[in-house]
């Protein structure tokens, strides 16, 4: 997605050899116009797959996920990183390692929000090692639902996440695919959409 790549080049900051800071439009401050376009592109990509729910993990995946759900006209669910006292029965959980934060979290979705009839599109802000999406796939399977696709805003293609998810049999669509960082400069591969 050329618009996203241009925004990364204009407002993204490379930190070290593996981190891209995009807090100007995605991970802290949200550019709703860009997120709306991202949602439209994901919805167009998966329009024929009978998606019934969009799922993400809080927090930075919420903006692109909600706009994708709006474009598909389906509900959006976000997995919580901290258990809420209102989540009492049938909680679906998975352990997820965050590459950026270097911590493992237990993420959860309340029971009853997903069912065996659901065809789920996962949306997330970044794909690095694939553990966040893998955890969501696990939760979706616990509910008996089917993960039919994964939409990624920014993929770090120099890490193994895509291969992990494709090996699980789930289609990955990334709107910006980073080949590498070179002296603070982002180099892209061809995006999926």
Curated annotation (Swiss-Prot):
It catalyses: XMP + diphosphate = xanthine + 5-phospho-alpha-D-ribose 1-diphosphate. Pathway: Purine metabolism; XMP biosynthesis via salvage pathway; XMP from xanthine: step 1/1. InterPro entries: PRibTrfase_dom, PRTase-like, Pur/Pyrimidine_PRTase, Xanthine_PRibTrfase. One of its GO terms (molecular function) is xanthine phosphoribosyltransferase activity. Gene3D superfamilies: 3.40.50.2020. Keywords: Cytoplasm, Glycosyltransferase, Purine salvage, Transferase. PANTHER family: HYPOXANTHINE/GUANINE PHOSPHORIBOSYLTRANSFERASE, XANTHINE PHOSPHORIBOSYLTRANSFERASE. This is Xanthine phosphoribosyltransferase. The lineage of its organism: Bacteria, Bacillati, Bacillota, Bacilli, Lactobacillales.
């Amino acid at each position: 997605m050329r618009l996203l790549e241009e925004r990364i080049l204009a407002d993204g900051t490379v930190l070290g050899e593996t981190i891209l800071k995009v807090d100007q439009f995605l991970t802290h401050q949200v550019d709703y116009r860009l997120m709306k376009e991202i949602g439209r592109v994901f919805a167009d990509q998966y329009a024929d797959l009978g998606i019934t729910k969009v799922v993400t993990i809080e927090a930075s995946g919420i903006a692109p996920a909600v706009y994708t759900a709006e474009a598909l006209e389906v509900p959006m669910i976000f997995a919580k990183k901290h258990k809420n006292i209102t989540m009492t029965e049938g909680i679906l959980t998975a352990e997820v390692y965050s590459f950026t934060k270097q911590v493992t979290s237990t993420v959860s979705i309340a029971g009853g929000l997903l069912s065996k009839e659901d065809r789920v599109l996962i949306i997330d802000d970044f794909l690095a090692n694939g553990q966040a999406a893998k955890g969501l796939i696990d939760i979706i399977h616990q509910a008996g639902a089917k993960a039919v696709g994964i939409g990624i805003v920014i993929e770090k293609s120099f890490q193994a996440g895509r291969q992990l998810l494709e090996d699980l049999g789930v289609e990955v669509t990334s709107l910006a695919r980073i080949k590498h960082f070179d002296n603070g400069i982002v180099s892209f591969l061809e995006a999926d959409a």
